[in-house]
Amino acid sequence: MYQILYGNQVVEEDLPNILEPWKAEIQHAIEAKLMTRPEVYSRPLRRSLKGYRKLRVGYYRIIFRIEEKTVKIFVIQHRSTVYYTTPDRI
């Protein structure tokens, strides 16, 4: 079982801007996929985001990194903006 750590900006900026039905869907995906087998359910990112991974939840993307038994989440945003925001947060 993996431990989940959220970045400050995820809690302060990303989550408040997500509608409630999507929050529930994202929370379910984190609990069902990232806490159990994140390397199986996610895909690695390339180029400047190498070393990070993404999990797709509908129109949203969760950008994170696996460090031993910890999953550190850096960004949860709509797919249209997530890749512009991510380099500033890592």
Q: Each PLM stretch: what is its role?
A:
Residues V57-G58, E67:
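Structural motif
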Residues E31-R56, Y84:
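A short, surface-exposed loop/turn module that caps and links secondary-structure elements
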Residues E20-R37, V75:
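A short, compositionally biased N-terminal segment around positions ~18-40 that is enriched
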Residues I4-L5, R65-I90:
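Enriched for short, Lys/Arg-rich terminal
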Residues M1-H28:
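Arg/Lys-rich, positively charged N-terminal/basic patches that mediate binding to nucleic acids
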